């Protein structure tokens, strides 16, 4: 269970880093918000899902 928690936490940290770097770059592109809206929303939804999954797994690990 600890290994699954660590992998999920690593995915959460990696996605957070990708969103912090990627969203401003996507919004600064010439097409901007219109072209990359779906990618930003799906990344944000996955991030929120990982927040809850990491929280739930944390209760099993500690």
UniProtKB/Swiss-Prot annotation:
- GO:BP terms for this protein? photosynthesis; photosystem II stabilization
Coarsely, its chief localization is: plastid
Q: How does the UniProt record describe the way this protein sits in the membrane?
A: Multi-pass membrane protein
Against InterPro entries, the record matches this protein to:
PSII_PsbZ, PSII_PsbZ_sf
Transmembrane among the record's keywords? yes
Q: Where in the cell is it found?
A: Plastid, Chloroplast thylakoid membrane
Q: Which Pfam families would you find in this protein's record?
A: Ycf9 (PF01737)
Which UniProt keyword terms apply here? Answer: Chloroplast, Membrane, Photosynthesis, Photosystem II, Plastid, Reaction center, Thylakoid, Transmembrane, Transmembrane helix
The UniProt record lists the keyword Transmembrane: yes
State the GO CC annotations. Answer: chloroplast thylakoid membrane; photosystem II reaction center
Q: Assembly and interactions?
A: PSII is composed of 1 copy each of membrane proteins PsbA, PsbB, PsbC, PsbD, PsbE, PsbF, PsbH, PsbI, PsbJ, PsbK, PsbL, PsbM, PsbT, PsbY, PsbZ, Psb30/Ycf12, at least 3 peripheral proteins of the oxygen-evolving complex and a large number of cofactors. It forms dimeric complexes.
User: In UniProt terms, what function does this protein have?
Assistant: May control the interaction of photosystem II (PSII) cores with the light-harvesting antenna, regulates electron flow through the 2 photosystem reaction centers. PSII is a light-driven water plastoquinone oxidoreductase, using light energy to abstract electrons from H(2)O, generating a proton gradient subsequently used for ATP formation.
Identify this protein by name: Photosystem II reaction center protein Z
Q: Which organism is it from?
A: Ostreococcus tauri
**The encoding gene:** psbZ
